[in-house]
UniProtKB/Swiss-Prot annotation:
Segments crossing the lipid bilayer: none
Keyword rRNA-binding applies: yes
Gene3D superfamilies xref list: 3.30.160.810, Translation factors
Stored Pfam families: Ribosomal_L3
Role noted for this protein: One of the primary rRNA binding proteins, it binds directly near the 3'-end of the 23S rRNA, where it nucleates assembly of the 50S subunit.
One GO process term, biological-process aspect: translation
Cellular component, GO annotation: cytosolic large ribosomal subunit
Gene Ontology MF term list: rRNA binding; structural constituent of ribosome
Protein name: Large ribosomal subunit protein uL3
Taxonomic lineage from the root: Bacteria, Bacillati, Bacillota, Clostridia, Eubacteriales
């Protein structure tokens, strides 16, 4: 059964498992999320729930969005996301989705926005080899060949070059839930997940598990 929740990355730490081995974990504050809208096949052409997460000041929300929340009879949320689930009928507008929908040992996929690195060269961005660093060499960290000469007389699309790195949507598959702490809305995930601390993430049960 598909399930999903929105959360906020708090940072990384390490805990000991039952065999006293150190396990690196990422701590995520997941939920509580509020169901703001239900989409149906008859009205929208597909089934999904729209979920809100995070507090936001009223003056930062525009009038159309404020009306959307008022119509649902729920509080304002910083983030709105849609999830296509198989059991949409089991959810009601205003219902809260909490971290206890996941259990320890479960496999999940985590989607977030990777850390932005700004403008980076080809070595850092694409892991290219650098040139000789010895005296007399005039080629150190440059791109090198960008393609052929008079034919085709152009550089092909997708040629690896320097440019903006990071700050893109990224998903890590098949991570393991180590522990959930429902009273604090925390979920401990084995390993690292995309994005900086305080970055928003979406946690779904794994599509490959």
């Amino acid at each position: 059964m598909k399930k999903a929740i929105i959360g906020r990355k708090l940072g990384m730490t390490q805990i000991f498992d039952e065999n006293n081995r150190v396990v690196p974990v990422t701590v995520v504050e997941a939920g509580p999320c509020t169901v703001v809208q239900k989409k149906s096949v008859e009205k929208d052409g597909y089934e999904a729930i729209q979920v809100g997460y995070g507090e936001i000041r009223e003056k930062l929300v525009n009038k159309p969005l404020k009306g959307h929340f008022e119509k649902a009879g729920v509080g304002l949320s910083r983030m709105l996301r849609e999830f296509k689930l198989e059991n949409v009928s089991e959810y009601q507008v205003g219902q809260e989705i909490k971290v206890d929908i996941f259990e320890a040992g479960e496999k999940i996929d985590v989607t977030g926005t990777s850390k932005g690195k700004g403008y980076q060269g080809i070595i850092k961005r694409w892991n290219a080899h650098r040139g000789p660093m010895s005296h007399g060499s005039k080629f150190h960290r440059a791109v090198g060949s960008m393609g052929a000469a008079s034919y085709p007389a152009r550089t092909f699309k997708n040629k690896r070059m320097a440019g903006h790195m990071g700050n893109v949507k990224s998903t890590v598959l098949n991570l393991e839930v180590v522990k959930t702490i429902p009273e604090k809305n925390l979920i401990l995930i084995k390993g690292g997940i995309p994005g900086p601390n305080k970055g928003y993430v979406i946690i779904r049960n794994s599509i490959k598990a």
